[in-house]
């Protein structure tokens, strides 16, 4: 189980650690060879390697490839790195620390201001400022407020929401909890 790493055109993909061998276009019939040769005998199956990761000195990190080296993964930083179904792996990578900090150190109004000042925008095409949206919700007088996760892709073939929900669902839950605290939600 793992989340989305990008490079969808090369999938299915598999990374074997600790050296980070990046196998591409893996088929079910390739698995016995990977297990026997790589996992049991310690020999990389070179025919399945993403060639850009192969150097005369060995295998370079996927993060050093042309596709990744200029990227800074923020929202997707854990995708493909942690088991998305294991909360302990999320916590081990500082998961839920932002929520703990918000609850312990900031008022809801301060959280909204921090989000406004950050320039954070929604992942949809409109790019609406998140802090502004939260301030509208916080100002709304209601007996009950909700935080909802709209993860319905509007563009056919787009996997922005799917990738984060499948690869790092706890980051979404943590963000929803922070939003709930900031706007005064009672349900989510």
Language-model region placement:
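Feature of Fe-S/electron-transfer and energy-metabolism proteins
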Residues: 1-188
């Amino acid at each position: 189980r793992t989340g989305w790493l990008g490079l969808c055109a090369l999938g299915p993909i598999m990374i074997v650690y600790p050296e980070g061998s990046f196998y591409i276009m893996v088929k079910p019939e390739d698995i016995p060879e990977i297990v026997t040769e790589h996992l049991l005998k310690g020999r990389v199956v070179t025919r399945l390697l993403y060639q850009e990761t192969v150097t005369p000195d060995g295998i370079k990190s996927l993060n050093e490839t042309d596709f990744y080296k200029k990227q800074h993964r923020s929202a997707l930083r854990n995708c493909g790195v942690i088991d998305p179904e294991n909360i302990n792996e999320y916590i081990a990578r500082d998961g839920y620390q932002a929520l703990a900090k918000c609850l312990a150190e900031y008022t809801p109004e301060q959280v909204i201001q921090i989000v406004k000042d950050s320039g954070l925008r929604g992942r949809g095409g409109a790019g609406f400022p998140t802090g502004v949206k939260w301030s509208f919700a916080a100002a709304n007088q209601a007996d009950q407020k909700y935080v909802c996760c709209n993860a319905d892709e509007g563009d056919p073939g787009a996997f922005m929401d799917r990738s984060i929900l499948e690869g790092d669902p706890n980051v979404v839950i943590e963000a929803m909890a922070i939003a709930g605290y900031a706007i005064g939600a009672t349900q989510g």
